[in-house]
Amino acid sequence: MTPNEFFSIKYHILAKAELKAYIDKLADYLSQQSYLYHTLDKPIISDSDYDKLFRLLQDLVNDNPQFKPINSVLDRVGGEVLAGFETIKHKKKMTSLANVFSLEELRDFYDKIEYDIELECEPKMDGLAISIFYKNGKFDYAVTRGDGIQGEKVSENVKTIRNVPLKLNTSNPPEELEVRGEIILDKQSFLSLNEYMQTHENKTFANPRNAAAGSIRMLDSKVVAKRPLKLYSYGIGYFSKDFVYPETQFELMQLLQSFGFTISDNMFLAKNFSEVEEYHHKMSHQRADLAYDIDGLVFKINNIKLQDTIGYTARGPKWAIAYKFPAEEVESEVLNVEFQVGRTGAITPVARLKPVAVGGVIVSNATLHNINEIKRKDIRVGDRVIVRRAGDVIPEVVKSLPQYRKSDAQIVEMPTNCPVCDSKIENVNDQAIYRCTGGWHCQAQTTERLKHFVSRKAMDIDKLGAKLIEQLVAANLIKYPADIYKLNFEQLTGLERMAAKSSQNVLDSITKSKEPSLARFIFAIGIKDIGEVSSDALANHFGSLESFRDAKFEELIEINYIGEIIANNIVSFWHDSLNIKIVEEFLAIGIKIQNPVKVEHAYNESFTGKTVVITGSFENYGRTELTQLLKSIGAKVTSSVSKKTDMVICGDNAGSKLTKAQELGVEVILEDNLKDLL
């Protein structure tokens, strides 16, 4: 689904089961977008749409707390850790700031604090967040944000950045200090790097942020050393007891500067809200002239004691706020409108534009979302239009400029047949979504389904990337997922740019994927609207593929995260003979699906019937894994502590939930004691 499709659904009239499914689907969608943005640095929706959807999810859950998803973006920051680097646990969680989008909202933040306060103001750099750990004043290691709990150890790459101190400039360094900042590439360096990349590698980065993030994730630090990356520090994380913390945020930044760190030369200390407005006005007008990209401004309460008093939410500090700039808009011309086909057959119109520079990037394509949007905005081929781009996303056409319309401008109509396979296109429930009915017979759907099948959270065939999938489909070497497991060395080496070593790596990766968990397999086969959370719930409920295949609608709607819409999709999937044939072919070629491990004792006297809250991070358990384990032995896992809570299971970096449990006298169980009870 697209953001507009989420907004178009009349959720206020949905039945409870449908509303729960809608909330779960929205939470899954936001988790995926968070992963694309924070981990892969490849967002596909704008920051503005993400923020609107996040607020929608917040509002829905506030009104329907019984439907709050477990481990959703409401509790997390960012996405999951990318494989390939050693994973390091943050000593102090890397949180993110709440966002505001207008001066009115910024004023509300200011007015909520019942004090006459100073705010430390600074630009919001658009780069890669990093945490650098120093031991006795010497560089120890560097870690990316990751999911906020743990990140990727990228020490060798970060050490190549010229302005990163390898030793703190002080004669009396603290025993331990964690400095946080943003790694960026300035605009001029970005243009120079892209010129080099285009000449030598025939590819370019979309923007400076992607260039910085991509550089830090390279395995060859010698290549990274040649790139003019820069670190701007904005604060500290963990620190040892011997560190003398300054009294104000502004003094902290000056201290970091004295240690040898670069801080923004556009920092400002506002003594009242009038000065905040002046700073906002100044930076908004100077933004385009800065040497580096910024996507907003950050405002922090200056007094450190007041920061401590105000405290934190699960997502981040309550004493700071990020103001996000509006997306950039420019004028262009629609040269043509083409229709693309997605994994589920959804038809998406895309405008081919007269190339135009937006935010330092040349844009020639923009999404039109759906045919209803085209008609609502009255966009025609040949029109002059306003194009908006925010971050590394597909730009969108905001509106047409009919006052400049030529007499030969063409009205855009939805095709009746698929532009790829010529199958009939059908409207879905009179909504904005039109779908190709070709299914596996449509090459576009086949390609996207296969990309989904091999993806990291599905079968995890990591060496079989999107471009190679496209090559294999175009060469008629694969059509259905099982065909992947029939590929041989000769077929792969016969493809363009596939050497012997690369081909063998692909085959090894395919072999490694032959024993997926049931949850992964359910997710991989691509049943419409089934995400990770739903796949886990289905796998844990049914326990085997055979039981899942025999699932009845009445049973499905009783499962957590499965509403009537998803239940219907599952039943329809298993009624399709081609789907059954595809799954049976998997089993015939030796795919061994691993069923969920059943707990020896279905119930545990320590947890059966108990209401349990989990807080903090754990060395031996993932949060989702622990939640599922506790549910499987009869516990009721909830997200908030109250008088009805029987126990709180507490990991590292526990926050307000632990404090509230202690205030209410609720039993607290530490990880060291948890194994014995389980």
Swiss-Prot record:
Determine the domain of life of the protein's source.
Bacteria
Q: Which residues make up the binding site for Zn(2+)?
A: C418, C421, C436, C442
> SMART domains, per this entry?
BRCT, HhH1, LIGANc
Active site (record annotation):
K124
* Positions of the BRCT domain: 602-678
- What are the alphabetically sorted keywords of the record? DNA damage, DNA repair, DNA replication, Ligase, Magnesium, Manganese, Metal-binding, NAD, Zinc
Name the Pfam families for this protein. Answer: BRCT, DNA_ligase_aden, DNA_ligase_OB, DNA_ligase_ZBD, HHH_2, Nlig-Ia
**Key word Isomerase present:** no
This enzyme catalyses: NAD(+) + (deoxyribonucleotide)n-3'-hydroxyl + 5'-phospho-(deoxyribonucleotide)m = (deoxyribonucleotide)n+m + AMP + beta-nicotinamide D-nucleotide
What are the required cofactors? Mg(2+); Mn(2+)
Q: Which residues bind NAD(+)?
A: D47, S48, D49, Y50, D51, S96, L97, E122, R145, E182, K300, K324
UniProt record similarity statement: Belongs to the NAD-dependent DNA ligase family. LigA subfamily.
Mind telling me what this protein is named? Answer: DNA ligase
